[in-house]
A protein has these predicted regions:
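Glycine-rich phosphate/pyrophosphate-handling loop used in enzymes and phosphotransfer proteins
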Residues: 1-140
Length: 140
């Protein structure tokens, strides 16, 4: 099968799965509307965003540490579902928020990396959630 044929088959499978299991917002769990990509419009407006003036922190041996959202309420619940509930499909939504935060803060990262899970935790969870985020952001 050609590459284009593979893409068509994969696209068909994705659309079919979306019919059976519609994509949901990782924060409020509402079914996404056709025009919404990864995060619903309501959550995009109401997520507890860290103000730009507080996003970028510096430390003694670290050039910068940034965060797009406060870790509370729906954000906290969403991250816990991602980390412990096997909802690895949330990774692209989180990666998009992280990349936006990097760009907003003028950080030109050459590489995104992570500390891998131990073998024991990897077996328990079935996937390395931090590794997925790093993988989604490698195109930074």
């Amino acid at each position: 099968m050609t590459k284009e044929g593979e893409r068509n088959v994969n696209s068909f499978i994705e659309r079919f799965l979306d019919l059976l299991f519609p994509p949901r917002c990782p924060f409020c769990r509402a079914i996404l509307k056709e025009h919404e990509t990864r995060i619903c419009a309501g959550c995009l407006q109401t997520l507890p965003r860290v103000p730009l003036s507080l996003q970028r922190q510096t430390f003694r041996h670290i050039e910068a540490c940034v965060s797009p959202l406060y870790y509370k309420d729906d954000v906290r619940s969403s991250l816990l579902r991602y980390k412990f509930g096997g909802l690895y499909t949330y990774s692209q939504a989180y990666a998009d928020l992280m990349l936006d935060c990097l760009e907003t803060n003028g950080i030109d990262a050459d590489l995104i990396t992570w500390v891998p899970l131990s073998d024991k935790r990897l077996r328990k969870r079935g996937y390395d959630q931090a590794g997925l985020l790093a993988d989604k952001n490698l195109a930074c």
